[in-house]
């Protein structure tokens, strides 16, 4: 089973994935971008830009990472439990200047039509995001600010709605303000 965690920065995806690592010791845990050697280099380029990258080039770099990630991680482990911190869904949401149909077609190509069976979407409000962003050193994407993140979160919700029409998937939406223990319990039940 292929499971992905989605949500903007600072909603607790990494915390919940860490808790699952204690339970699912044989699962494959991965992330996008950066789940492969190529992905680590691309992630560094994308998150710590030293010069401007146009939106089309940025999209294609993310797609290159996704295609490599599919080949090295997803394809070779498709009969195991795979839990990913982000996926093509975030890619579609962050590429908000492009149409969903185009983004879906490009991602379908990069993933050879291999999509998650379950999506866990952690949703946060402005206060939660502000509080958590203030506690960390920000990368180039995080420096775009709260309004940017809330617009991406809105786009994530629209992408999830779009995907319900395109692929067979179960989606669990959770309020990131809940305690990590309560969220963990809800996630465990969803994965059974």
Swiss-Prot record:
Its EC number is 2.7.4.9. One of its GO terms (cellular component) is cytosol. ATP binds at residues 7-14. Keywords: ATP-binding, Kinase, Nucleotide biosynthesis, Nucleotide-binding, Transferase. The keyword Transmembrane helix does not apply. Phosphorylation of dTMP to form dTDP in both de novo and salvage pathways of dTTP synthesis. Belongs to the thymidylate kinase family. HAMAP family: Thymidylate_kinase (MF_00165). NCBIfam families: DTMP_kinase. This is Thymidylate kinase.
